[in-house]
Amino acid sequence: METLQGLLLWLLLSMGGAQASREPLRPLCRPINATLAAEKEACPVCVTVNTTICAGYCPTMMRVLQAVLPPVPQVVCNYREVRFESIRLPGCPPGVDPMVSVPVALSCRCALCRRSTSDCGGPKDHPLTCDDPNLQASSSSKDPPPSPPSPSRLLEPAGTPFLPQ
């Protein structure tokens, strides 16, 4: 009887009854749709903009003997190529530049976190939504993403060149 049960178990397992998926468990680093908030202190309107950002999983390692060996540098999902699109904020008073630059991720990669261009974790200094929801206006022709993730933010002036690492 035990031989028969063992044979049946072997047969089920060998036919793919317990087969691992070839897909990664977490989505890897790639451009994804996201909604960002664009606002200026002097302008009375906050505009939400649909764009692409870099997000996803990057393989990392941690040393077992942390006290003896130096830490292993951790990589995060970073922009490889990015372009900036200018958005005009409506209702800005005269003398205030109504243009805001928004990043559009063209490609991404796993690399060391660059604080100059990425949100490396820790306290958030810029909200991902408008400060005052009553002032919110929408400015986008694309369909909104299914759910806004916690993105790396990359808001720089349009004239600032971006050089990939």
Curated annotation (Swiss-Prot):
Arranged from A to Z, the UniProt key words for this protein are:
Disulfide bond, Glycoprotein, Hormone, Secreted, Signal
| GO biological process per UniProt | G protein-coupled receptor signaling pathway
Miscellaneous notes for this chain? Answer: There are at least five copies of CG-related genes and at least two of these are expressed in the baboon placenta.
Q: What does this protein do?
A: Stimulates the ovaries to synthesize the steroids that are essential for the maintenance of pregnancy.
Gene3D superfamilies listed in its UniProt record: Cystine-knot cytokines (2.10.90.10)
Mention one GO molecular function: hormone activity
- Oligomer status and interactors: Heterodimer of a common alpha chain and a unique beta chain which confers biological specificity to thyrotropin, lutropin, follitropin and gonadotropin.
**Where is region (Disordered) located?**
131-165
Official protein name in the record: Choriogonadotropin subunit beta
